[in-house]
Amino acid sequence: MKNILKKQILWAIPLAFSLLTSSCSDYLDKLPENTVEVEGIDYTNKSNMYMPVSGVYATARGYLGSWSSYGCIIVRGDDVNKGGSPTDQIEYEYASKFQYDRLTTFWALSGLWGNCYYVVSTSNSALESLENYAKHLTSESDKQLNAQYAAEVRFFRAYAYFQLVNLFGDVPLLLDNQELNVFKNTKEDVKKYIYDELDYCIANLPAIRPNESEHPGAVTKYTADM
């Protein structure tokens, strides 16, 4: 009986180890949920060409509309007052008076920087995908649609830089996600870049109202021309 039990244990140990390592491998060998798979994408399937554009809209909605970041911008004009007591969220009081030296550790300002560059990074990836789709397009209508989609993405990238340059002045101008050596560009260069991007958007976006778009609410020529 003892020998039988010993044999069963010796047989069970490697089996259990095999199952354990196999299940762990299956569990761990997965792409992170926030990772977009770039291998194996069929860029000849033009029906999927809008997918990277849709991702930029989702990113812009989540990262450019933050109340905390937006507050840093609007309190600097005459449209909105901070309100509340003088000590309530006093950082917005500093922002309204352009006292940026007192905002170096303000979490909302740091968040706006990160949010805008996340939109830039997402836009760069989307534009790279659109370029890959464009290589396989043959009809003029499809090429025009590809240019329109690129214009939608470039609008959001330009808008992110509009926020950055207005709050920080000189900022790095990143036009792709491959750049390793990053340096600040002058405020004048960034603003010229924004104007050039908007010119491209105006030339390639449809002259319709947003509710008339194939994707209702999408940016149009009039959005870029405002």
Annotate each predicted stretch with a short phrase:
Residues 46-54, 58-63, 87-168, 180-192, ...:
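Conserved, well-structured interaction surfaces
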Residues 29, 78-82, 88, 170, ...:
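Acidic side chains
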Residues 24-75:
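Membrane-proximal, proline-rich intrinsically disordered regions
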Residues 30-31, 165-175:
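Short, well-structured active-site flanking segments
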Residues 39-43, 47, 67-87, 205-226:
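Short, surface-exposed recognition loops and adjoining beta-strand edges that mediate ligand/DNA contacts
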Residues 33, 65, 69, 135, ...:
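Secondary-structure boundary/capping residues
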Residues 1-33:
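Bacterial Sec-dependent N-terminal signal peptides
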Residues 34-38, 139-143, 173-180:
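Short linear capping/connector segments at secondary-structure termini
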